[in-house]
Each structure stands twice: as structure tokens, then as C-alpha cells.
């Protein structure tokens, strides 16, 4: 019987424990974690994501503010705003909601955010630290949350064969390095890969992040595998499905995540955790309790 991994419950449990640690930071260290989110324009999906992040932050004791800027803002004006937040010692985390308008360079914006305040973990320096396996860095939230879900089923991943489908900088590539650090043998597949089914059929762990509904078929998955579905796709007038054939794989996999209610809540939980880690690092407080 397949275990359906309840990402919402696991995320809520994490945030409850994090809230207790935030209370300690406030009481004993006079640290009041603060997250600033920059939203460009009025993309409905982005508005929902940002609202969910702010709601969760406030519920666990993180001060949060969303700064809404017009869609036609100049790139240099946005950079100036980010630099203001970089220089504000009361701000510990800065998140610029993606995607950005076409006239703005995402790379320049991401790398303008201070390395220590980069709670998305997208800054080139944080990416480099992840690749090197350093622990005291900010790691992208979705891969970090996905790994936590995998380890909720199986703690020791050493020697496991893992397949990551998708090579984005946000999910696929950092997921590859996180699994590598767990001593997995990792294969990353993408749009130009051949024989995807063959690779997946040998995998103990499959992480799907391609943005294509029901892309991963049941006959690709070996019995007893752990399947993490990062995708969230809208089909049939608002119905949400993931990147894997949930009904087909259920009963075959050892464990799998649903969509919604799997990886999504974990992404927000680890954004909260990254904000607290960032506050600790900036204030010289040992953040080891939050980095595991």
C-alpha cells in the first residue's frame, strides 16, 4: 500500500516547532526575524503565492511585508529598492517574486539581493556553496522541502538510485546536489534526454519537476519507489494535477506526494526556515538547529 505523504501536516509541524524557536530568538537574543517580499505587477498566481507566504510568516511570529511595485518599473529602480532593503539591518530576508516582467533581468535582480538575505537561495554565491556541499548557506526552498519529505519516509538515502526530471535552477539542479550530498547516485533528466522510462524504472527515488501534467507514467516507476511530485498544473477549468500519474502510480510506489498538499506547503515552510537562518547568520547566532 502506498503512503500518501501529507506535506501539509509535515509543514505545519515544522512551522509549529519553528515558531517556538522564534520565540526563543526574540526573548533571549532580541532577534525579530523580518521578511520583505517584492511583487512586481498583478499576476494573479503570484498574488496568491505571496499572500500565502505572508500569512504563514505572520502566524509563526515572522514580521512580513509585501512591497507591490508597478509592472512597468524600470530595472534600475527595482535594483535601487533592493539595495535599500539590503542596507536595512532590521530586514533579514528579501524575496523577489518570480517571474519578472520581460524587460527586467532576473539574473541581475537575484544577484543584487544580499547573499545573507537571499532566502530563495538563488544568488550565485549561495548556489556555489550548495554545489560545494557547504552547510552554512541558504538553500532553495522547494528542493530542501522535497528532500525533507523523502527523508520522512527513509532517513538513510546512501547508495539509493535517484532520478530528477527537470533541470531548472529553482528545483532540478539544486535537487540534484542535495541528493548527491545524501550519497545517492543521481541522474538528471530533461527535455532532450532519451529513454526516460528506462532511467526511472531503475530509480529508488523519482523527483518530477517538469511542469507537464501527468508526464510520468505508472509503468516508468518501479515497485517500492519514493515519488516526489513538484509539478502543479491547471487542467479542465481549474483542476490541479501534478507531473506524475497519481492514480496510476498509487499502489505501486512505496510513498508519493499528492498535488495539491504535497511539496507546496513544504516550500513555504522552508522559506520561513530560511528567513530564520538568515536572521541568525546576520546576527552571529548559531543557526545549526535550523540547517539540518
UniProtKB/Swiss-Prot annotation:
Q: Which residues bind NADP(+)?
A: 166-168, 191, 232
Instruction: State which Enzyme Commission number(s) the record gives.
Output: 1.5.1.5, 3.5.4.9
GO BP term (any one): L-histidine biosynthetic process
Task: Please give one Pfam family short name.
Answer: THF_DHG_CYH_C
Q: Name one GO molecular function term.
A: methenyltetrahydrofolate cyclohydrolase activity
Q: Which domain of life is it from?
A: Bacteria
Q: GO CC annotations?
A: cytosol
> Which pathway features in its UniProt record?
One-carbon metabolism; tetrahydrofolate interconversion
UniProt KW keywords? Amino-acid biosynthesis, Histidine biosynthesis, Hydrolase, Methionine biosynthesis, Multifunctional enzyme, NADP, One-carbon metabolism, Oxidoreductase, Purine biosynthesis
- Does the keyword tRNA-binding belong to this entry? no
Reactions mediated catalytically: (6R)-5,10-methylene-5,6,7,8-tetrahydrofolate + NADP(+) = (6R)-5,10-methenyltetrahydrofolate + NADPH; (6R)-5,10-methenyltetrahydrofolate + H2O = (6R)-10-formyltetrahydrofolate + H(+)
Q: Keyword Nucleotide-binding: yes or no?
A: no
The UniProt family comment states: Belongs to the tetrahydrofolate dehydrogenase/cyclohydrolase family.
Annotated PANTHER family: C-1-TETRAHYDROFOLATE SYNTHASE, CYTOPLASMIC, C-1-TETRAHYDROFOLATE SYNTHASE, CYTOPLASMIC-RELATED
User: What does the protein in this record do?
Assistant: Catalyzes the oxidation of 5,10-methylenetetrahydrofolate to 5,10-methenyltetrahydrofolate and then the hydrolysis of 5,10-methenyltetrahydrofolate to 10-formyltetrahydrofolate.
Give the NCBIfam families listed for this entry. Answer: PRK10792.1, PRK14187.1, PRK14188.1
SUBUNIT field: Homodimer.
Q: What is this protein called?
A: Bifunctional protein FolD
The gene for this chain is folD
Amino acid at each position: 500500500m502506498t503512503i500518501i505523504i501529507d506535506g501539509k501536516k509535515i509543514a505545519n509541524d515544522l512551522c509549529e516547532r519553528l515558531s517556538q524557536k522564534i520565540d526563543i530568538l526574540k526573548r533571549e537574543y532580541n532577534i525579530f526575524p523580518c521578511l520583505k517580499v517584492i511583487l512586481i505587477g498583478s499576476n494573479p498566481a503570484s498574488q496568491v503565492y505571496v499572500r500565502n507566504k505572508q500569512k504563514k510568516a505572520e502566524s509563526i511570529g515572522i514580521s512580513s511585508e509585501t512591497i507591490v511595485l508597478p509592472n512597468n518599473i524600470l530595472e534600475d529602480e527595482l535594483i535601487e529598492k533592493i539595495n535599500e532593503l539590503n542596507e536595512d539591518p532590521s530586514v533579514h530576508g528579501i524575496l523577489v517574486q518570480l517571474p519578472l516582467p520581460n524587460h527586467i533581468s532576473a539574473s541581475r535582480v537575484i544577484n543584487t539581493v544580499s547573499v545573507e538575505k537571499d532566502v530563495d537561495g538563488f544568488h550565485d554565491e549561495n548556489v556555489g556553496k550548495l554545489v560545494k556541499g557547504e552547510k552554512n548557506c541558504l538553500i532553495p526552498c522547494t528542493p530542501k522541502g522535497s528532500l525533507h519529505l523523502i527523508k520522512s519516509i527513509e532517513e538513510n538515502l546512501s547508495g539509493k538510485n535517484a532520478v530528477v526530471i527537470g533541470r531548472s535552477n529553482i528545483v532540478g539542479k539544486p535537487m540534484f546536489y542535495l541528493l548527491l550530498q545524501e550519497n545517492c547516485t543521481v541522474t538528471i533528466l530533461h527535455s532532450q534526454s532519451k529513454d526516460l522510462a528506462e532511467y526511472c524504472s531503475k530509480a529508488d527515488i523519482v523527483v518530477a519537476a517538469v511542469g507537464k501534467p501527468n508526464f510520468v507514467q505508472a509503468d516508468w516507476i518501479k515497485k517500492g519507489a519514493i515519488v516526489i511530485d513538484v509539478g502543479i498544473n491547471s487542467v479542465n477549468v481549474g483542476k490541479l494535477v501534478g507531473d506524475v500519474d497519481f492514480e496510476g502510480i498509487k499502489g505501486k510506489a512505496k510513498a508519493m506526494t499528492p498535488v495539491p498538499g504535497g511539496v507546496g506547503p513544504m516550500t513555504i515552510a522552508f522559506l520561513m526556515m530560511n528567513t530564520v537562518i538568515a536572521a541568525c547568520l546576520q546576527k552571529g547566532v548559531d543557526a545549526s538547529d535550523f540547517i539540518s
